[in-house]
């Protein structure tokens, strides 16, 4: 490896680093790029298809983006915002597919109807109100609603088969939903980066980040095969290491990370590959979260397409582990505690009793209780058809709050040094689905003097970047149809 400073170092071989690298390579093709990945392959943590649900998060079915207010009203603003962000990701992927820089789209994205399914009178009323708010929104065009069991049975037979006919049920369906294999997408993006001159350093664990007197970043890494140390200098560093990002940003010494902590939540899914069952369900069906449950724990029964094979997934079942990564250590959480963040972390523990109660309940749940949750969606589920698999770790952001002392923040947050020389990403859902708008915002924040010059290229890749679609019905319809045609998705 050369001793010359590297223009861009990406730490972590997941979807975020791959997306940022793909953008930088196109807006500034002469820059050198190196990716450090501690494991032997990229996309093995949160981006691995079995470590996430693979939902193309566009708020078509996820109720947590449109909660019911105390007065019974539902505000579509958050759902519209999430959908707008996903459209930017779709445009970026479509541009790379059209240019031949990504493989056949079916290798990483497939049409899968997105449904919401609820039970009980009050939940039915809520879903009806949600539908009324969304049905005329351009980005939600084509959404269907039904309280009729026979209609719902046509959409997703497993939901109604042998269900008590007296139970009030309702569902929405949006045929334009997607299932995304973020592992395959990450690998394809990284392959394209390497083919264009980027360097991929696998089995390299970054141990420290230090600022030099001349404004560069000194990166010390260890080759995990042979334990040999490596050093490099970088002009810009992105820490896209998933749950490992907090530790590395803390080691960098930037003041912007002070007061931030991480709350790790583990997950499990039930999975079946039984062809007779899989053939009866082609949808991602989301329900309503339990009281206190974090957003990524909304129960859902999903069609998954991974490596061309179709299966069904149900969950997630949340749990607690102090590990920040699936391959992390039991010291991850205690090792992240600092004088500057212990106050916010204690405040979060004090104010989130419902979450703690929920997690304890999930930890205590045995297989029969997990199957009972599945049978609320699929009454005919049999234990012998389903296996329990471990999903990835999610580290929720805890941060200072002037009023409460500390708050638990769901979603993602970009932490960047004031001079823009280093940035990292904390948090979870909707995460990968909105990687493209997150990285566009990061470029604008970290390279303000260059961003205007990059905009023409970004607009070629993402035509509506910097604008919105939902308030322009004709443009929304055009973009949805164009990206669907390129990505071979339902329109």
Swiss-Prot record:
Membrane spanning stretches: none
Cofactor: FAD
GO term, biological process aspect, one: tricarboxylic acid cycle
Organism annotation: Leifsonia xyli subsp. xyli (strain CTCB07)
EC number, as in UniProt: 1.1.5.4
Family to which the UniProt record says this protein belongs: Belongs to the MQO family.
Keyword Flavoprotein: yes
Name assigned to this protein: Probable malate:quinone oxidoreductase
Catalytic reaction annotation: (S)-malate + a quinone = a quinol + oxaloacetate
Pathway the protein contributes to: Carbohydrate metabolism; tricarboxylic acid cycle; oxaloacetate from (S)-malate (quinone route): step 1/1
This protein's record includes keyword Flavoprotein: yes
SUPFAM superfamilies: FAD/NAD(P)-binding domain
Keyword vocabulary terms for this entry: FAD, Flavoprotein, Oxidoreductase, Tricarboxylic acid cycle
Pfam family, one: Mqo
Superkingdom, natural source: Bacteria
Stored PANTHER family: L-2-HYDROXYGLUTARATE DEHYDROGENASE, MITOCHONDRIAL
Gene Ontology molecular function, alphabetical: 2-hydroxyglutarate dehydrogenase activity; L-malate dehydrogenase (quinone) activity
């Amino acid at each position: 490896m050369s001793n010359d400073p590297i223009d861009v170092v990406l730490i972590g071989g997941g979807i975020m680093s791959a997306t940022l690298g793909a953008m930088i390579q196109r807006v500034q093709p002469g820059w050198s790029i190196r990716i450090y990945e501690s494991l032997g392959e990229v996309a093995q943590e949160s981006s691995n298809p079995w470590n996430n649900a693979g939902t193309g998060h566009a708020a078509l079915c996820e109720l947590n983006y449109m909660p019911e207010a105390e007065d019974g009203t539902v505000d579509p603003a958050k759902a519209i915002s999430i959908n707008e962000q996903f459209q930017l990701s779709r445009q970026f992927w479509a541009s790379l597919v059209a240019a031949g820089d990504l493989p056949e789209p079916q290798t990483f994205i497939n049409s899968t109807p997105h449904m919401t399914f609820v039970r009980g009178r009050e939940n039915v009323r809520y879903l009806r109100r949600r539908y009324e708010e969304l049905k005329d929104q351009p980005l939600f065009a084509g959404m269907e609603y039904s309280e009729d069991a026979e209609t719902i049975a046509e959409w997703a037979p497993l939901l109604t088969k042998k269900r008590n006919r007296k139970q009030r049920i309702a569902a929405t369906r949006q045929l334009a939903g997607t299932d995304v294999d973020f592992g395959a997408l990450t690998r394809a993006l990284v392959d394209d980066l390497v083919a264009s001159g980027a360097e991929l350093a696998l089995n390299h664990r970054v141990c420290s980040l230090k600022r030099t007197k001349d404004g560069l970043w000194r990166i010390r890494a260890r080759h995990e095969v042979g334990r040999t140390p490596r050093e490099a200098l970088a002009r810009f560093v992105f820490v896209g290491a998933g749950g490992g990002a907090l530790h590395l940003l803390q080691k960098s010494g930037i003041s912007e990370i002070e007061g931030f902590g991480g709350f790790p939540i583990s997950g499990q899914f039930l999975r079946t590959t039984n062809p007779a069952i899989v053939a009866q369900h082609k949808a991602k069906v989301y329900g309503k979260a339990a009281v206190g449950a974090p957003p990524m724990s909304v129960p859902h029964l999903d069609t998954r397409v991974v490596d061309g094979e179709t299966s069904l997934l149900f969950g997630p079942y949340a749990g607690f582990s102090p590990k920040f990564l699936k391959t992390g250590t039991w010291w991850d959480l205690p090792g992240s505690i600092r004088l500057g963040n212990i106050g916010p972390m204690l405040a979060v523990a004090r104010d989130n009793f419902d979450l703690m109660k929920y997690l304890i309940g999930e930890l205590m749940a045995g297989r029969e209780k997990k199957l009972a949750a599945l049978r609320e969606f699929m009454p005919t589920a049999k234990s012998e058809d389903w296996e329990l698999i471990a999903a990835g770790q999610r580290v929720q952001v805890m941060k200072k709050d002037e009023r409460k002392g500390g708050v638990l923040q769901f979603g993602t947050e970009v932490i960047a040094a004031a001079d823009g020389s280093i940035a990292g990403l904390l948090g979870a859902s909707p995460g990968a689905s909105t990687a493209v708008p997150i990285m566009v915002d990061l470029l604008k924040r970290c390279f303000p003097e260059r961003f205007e010059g990059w905009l023409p290229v970004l607009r070629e890749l993402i035509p509506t970047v910097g604008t919105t679609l939902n308030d322009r019905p004709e443009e929304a319809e055009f973009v949805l149809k164009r990206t669907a045609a390129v990505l071979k998705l339902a329109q």
